[in-house]
Amino acid sequence: DSSTSRGLGDVYKRQGIVLILSVALAMILANSNIAESYFHFFEQEVGFIVNGEPYLNYSLHHWINDGLMAMFFFVVGLELKREFIGGELADIRNTILPISAAIGGMIVPALIFLSLNIGTPHTMGWGIPMATDIAFALGVVYLLGDKVPVSAKVFLTTLAIVDDLGAVLVIAFFYTSELSIASLLFGLGFLAVMFIGNRLGIKSLFFYAALGIGGVWVTFLLSGIHATIAAVLAAFMIPADAKINESVYLKRMKKLTRRFEHEEANEVRTLEEGQVDVLTHIQHDTEIAIPLLQQLEHKISPIVTFLIMPIFAIANAGISFTDLSLSDIFSTHVALGVTLGLLLGKPIGIIGATFLMVKMRWATLPSAITRRTLLGLGTVSYTHLTLPTILRV
């Protein structure tokens, strides 16, 4: 439906515009008279006191990136599950290409960094240019609205998720000095309970919220692994089927609309009690006819778009240009490795792996994705908010 497409396009454009305005505000604050207060504000530690001891005590910046952004990744996980069930990714063959592209987009930047830093104390920094800032990469694509094919958005989303999973695994196995296996096992246990609940037909929002937040997210946070990965995994445990199916819903609606028609209308603006009762039943049946997965997706998405994403951008995109010049990018092997890894390695790895898979006939490029579209996706994939921080180290 063209009107629906235009409506979604407008939503995506608003998402992108809000994101860009938030980044601009962060830039202004980082280079204003209150820059010091701006940076200090997000470094303040926030936590809980349990028996006089600090518990879950992290900086505000950490809470935003591992806490609030978990909601963003949760929504992304819900969207991905929906695509796996009945969308672009329902055919497993459609996942091979973005997964391969993501792997290529991780390996090439790491190799570029290593080639410039091999034999130096900075060799272990090879993991820095591997990750994509999925939130910003998708924000840029969504800003273009319906000009970007749905298959291209799904391709980038899958690619970015795999990319992020890869980065999390790299951090967990190569950069995490204190990985708590016990906490991780507890987290996996909570995931297993969510999975069993889903298989048993439990549709309670409280059940999944309590286990997802109080169980999976907290234990992953304590384990030392990036807690946003918990959000993606928890999203895949949310039921994708409704309490009543379409045929039952249609039968109930026909019965209720007939009842509504036969209710005697009054001559005032208010409805008769019988009409109100019918509409209440229609509202209830409509709610339970929507799968919990889609209910959560539609309820949380606006919060993520217009509250969480702006906060994330303001907290992370502030770059102070006072002590930063273009020459800094090429001043050290670390900075050069990260810069070239992101700007060249990322798109080369993604596009190269994609063309290789298609050329070898191991995968098929969706018809809506042209070479030009692929080049654009490869280019936007190097969006990365941590680069300025790295350059200052």
Task: Report each predicted region and the residues it spans.
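Single conserved hydrophobic/aromatic residue that forms the stacking wall/gate
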Residues: 1-9, 384-393
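Entry/N-cap segments of selected transmembrane alpha helices
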Residues: 83-111, 180-189, 323-348, 375-378
